[in-house]
Amino acid sequence: MKNEKRKTGIEPKVFFPPLIIVGILCWLTVRDLDAANVVINAVFSYVTNVWGWAFEWYMVVMLFGWFWLVFGPYAKKRLGNEPPEFSTASWIFMMFASCTSAAVLFWGSIEIYYYISTPPFGLEPNSTGAKELGLAYSLFHWGPLPWATYSFLSVAFAYFFFVRKMEVIRPSSTLVPLVGEKHAKGLFGTIVDNFYLVALIFAMGTSLGLATPLVTECMQWLFGIPHTLQLDAIIITCWIILNTICVACGLQKGVRIASDVRSYLSFLMLGWVFIVSGASFIMNYFTDSVGMLLMYLPRMLFYTDPIAKGGFPQGWTVFYWAWWVIYAIQMSIFLARISRGRTVRELCFGMVLGLTASTWILWTVLGSNTLLLIDKNIINIPNLIEQYGVARAIIETWAALPLSTATMWGFFILCFIATVTLVNACSYTLAMSTCREVRDGEEPPLLVRIGWSVLVGIIGIVLLALGGLKPIQTAIIAGGCPLFFVNIMVTLSFIKDAKQNWKD
């Protein structure tokens, strides 16, 4: 009995430090929101202006790593001795479906507006040149480059899972080949795990902070319920209670079904927007944008704007590269777990093709629709953002479509389900990472899952209370800094161990 308690109990050294750190930061923020915003702006400016170049070089180096994996000595190595667990079609679909979160729907619908209103390269706002580059930059930020950079971590985790047969629930477990077992299981490994967990908590709170206003704005549009911070807090509380009920009553199968419904509904909604918005324009705009991407790719890769100091690469490229860095471990573990039996080359190509198709389709359809609505003066996004906030502007891009009531119901259900599955995934991932010896496939303790879902919910509410996108962007960038080094260490650990143990 004692052994069972030990197995399912919390791991104090990785449970309490993140809890205390995040709790203190939330308390300090709530005490003085104005002072918190000043600090947030200072942190954002420092990291993006002083260290933005490091994130850009990280992505470029990891891109070269993708080519090394695809064409190097490990390209034909198989990740495990078993045949692939899923058919190729199912495998690609699972990767495709993993990109349909509410946060992705948020950025896909509004991102292009920011690119054309505050464009890069000194272009005039809302000019023809700005509009030509608008979607191209979305394809850059959400295309082959970031997915290729995930390859190293995905291959690394798949190698540790299926070749080395390691139980990996925290990144420190993978660092034994690099720093030795003493350091990986000692203070150094504990620090690494705490960096990972604090960053992950803020990332998940950020996603919740993006998703919640979409749901509450839908409720205002459909039911006339005014969107307030109190309503946001009530909705987040309802999600936490619903997640608790699902876990306590063993309804995890229902959550998985909801995840599948989310995927199919997202395809249906995207198909609807594609048809009624203007399929011909969308395809033409996409084709032109791919050409613009190829033409400007070298400059996009290394654009830091140190002379004109317009702020575009700091506000967007560095922010998104930090976004990719902060989610890299969690996403790579998922991609690795569904890729057992694949070769390294298959995994690398599958990620770039399957995941790029997902994000490119979503950004092309939603971004093109937003641009059409702006060009036709159907909606005034600047006024909507100034008066009501970004979420209202996003809702209006959907409400402007034909059969608006049916469309809004579909979008409301999609966002609600996406956030339910988000809260469930947040609580599960954090609980697994902070409990002692909970193995894959086992359920972590209920109270631990509830506790983490409550904390993530609090972070979402705090970010919403601060208002605007800058706090959300800063939370991602601040969290991305320590994981920048953690990701590199996991990659180097894989390379070192593979050279010694993955020979013919």
Swiss-Prot record:
Give the protein's function. Answer: Catalyzes the exchange of L-carnitine for gamma-butyrobetaine.
The GO annotation for biological process reads: 4-(trimethylammonio)butanoate transport; carnitine metabolic process
Principal location class: membrane
Protein name as catalogued: L-carnitine/gamma-butyrobetaine antiporter
Stored InterPro entries? BCCT_CS, BCCT_transptr, BCCT_transptr_CaiT
Subunit and partners? Homotrimer.
Matching entries from Pfam families are given as: BCCT
> Which keywords does this Swiss-Prot/TrEMBL entry list?
Antiport, Cell inner membrane, Cell membrane, Membrane, Transmembrane, Transmembrane helix, Transport
Tell me a GO cellular component: plasma membrane
Encoded by which gene? caiT
Q: Which family does it belong to?
A: Belongs to the BCCT transporter (TC 2.A.15) family. CaiT subfamily.
The membrane-spanning stretches of this chain are 10-30, 51-71, 92-112, 143-163, 195-215, 231-251, 263-283, 316-336, 347-367, 398-418, 446-466, 475-495
Q: What is the lineage of its organism?
A: Bacteria, Pseudomonadati, Pseudomonadota, Gammaproteobacteria, Enterobacterales
